[in-house]
């Protein structure tokens, strides 16, 4: 039974990752209204007409439905056969976040909402993926969340502060997409050919996100340097901080590629999905470090 639970946990994490990526595609392709103002039907049908926008939106809905069924099965088996309280917490939070984002998605179709609320939809998807990833890790060698070395309070503060700040940066990125402000800054690293552009409208929104992303990179770089200096002998802390730096570096690069590809619609959609997927991985590694700091208190 343990192997079945592990497989379902892995499928859940993969499914949540796919939902997050497809949600980013829905936003980038402006397909959120691809099924009109109907839910769960799409233009009055279970199988909609084969337009691009309806196909993207309906595929996203279908994947959410299938993954939700997998989560329910995983939830039952974890509470029935797994004794670890952290596993029960992770699957509970995954299910809760998935249900909330599904409800928000349905409401967004029926009653159009502000960009501030729509951006939160991606944030909830990110949390759902992070919890599902932690659940999957429970059944691996990384799932024994006790670090090999005591962690200083300063490092713990840096980990948690960086993780919370990363969520804010991700929210700003989602807000950029939902306000269709991406074109506010043409070119990278300069914005409209300027180091500091006129901070109005879409340009101000995009430039704020860029500065926030730069500060996030510096925070994770500081996290990595501290881990290398003090915790290189701890495989788990070293693993999490190293991959957090790798993914935030890829995030910066992919953000630049998204800007450069704005003239090509296909490339723009593809790079936007890649950017969202890298963001999810980065946040997942930061959450893993947070769990290590929590369990250090019990060591």
Q: What role is predicted for each listed range?
A:
Residues 1-299:
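Polytopic transmembrane helical bundles with strong interfacial aromatic enrichment
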């Amino acid at each position: 039974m343990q192997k079945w639970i592990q497989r379902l946990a892995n499928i859940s994490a993969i499914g949540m990752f796919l939902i997050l990526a497809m949600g980013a595609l829905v936003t980038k392709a402006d397909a959120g209204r691809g099924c009109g103002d109907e839910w769960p039907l799409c233009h009055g049908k279970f199988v909609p007409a084969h337009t691009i926008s309806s196909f993207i939106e309906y595929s996203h809905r279908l994947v959410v439905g299938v993954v939700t069924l997998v989560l329910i099965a995983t939830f039952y088996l974890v509470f029935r056969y797994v004794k670890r309280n952290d596993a029960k917490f992770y699957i509970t939070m995954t299910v809760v976040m998935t249900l909330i984002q599904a409800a928000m998605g349905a409401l967004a179709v029926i009653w159009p909402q502000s960009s501030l609320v729509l951006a939160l939809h991606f944030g909830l998807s990110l949390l759902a993926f992070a919890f599902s990833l932690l659940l999957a890790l429970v059944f691996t060698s990384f799932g024994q969340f006790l670090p090999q070395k005591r962690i200083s309070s300063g490092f713990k503060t840096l980990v948690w502060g960086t993780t919370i700040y990363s969520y804010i940066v991700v929210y700003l990125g989602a807000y950029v997409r939902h306000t269709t402000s991406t074109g506010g800054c043409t070119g990278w690293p300069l914005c409209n050919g300027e180091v500091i552009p006129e901070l109005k409208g879409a340009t101000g929104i995009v430039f704020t996100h860029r500065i926030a992303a730069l500060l996030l990179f510096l925070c994770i770089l500081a996290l990595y340097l501290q881990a290398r200096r003090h915790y290189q002998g701890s495989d788990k802390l070293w693993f999490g901080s190293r991959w957090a730096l790798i993914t935030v570096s890829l995030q910066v690069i992919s953000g630049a590629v998204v800007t450069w590809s704005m003239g090509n619609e296909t490339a723009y959609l593809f790079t936007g999905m890649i950017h969202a997927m890298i963001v999810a991985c980065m946040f997942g590694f930061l959450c893993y470090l947070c769990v290590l700091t929590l369990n250090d208190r019990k060591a």
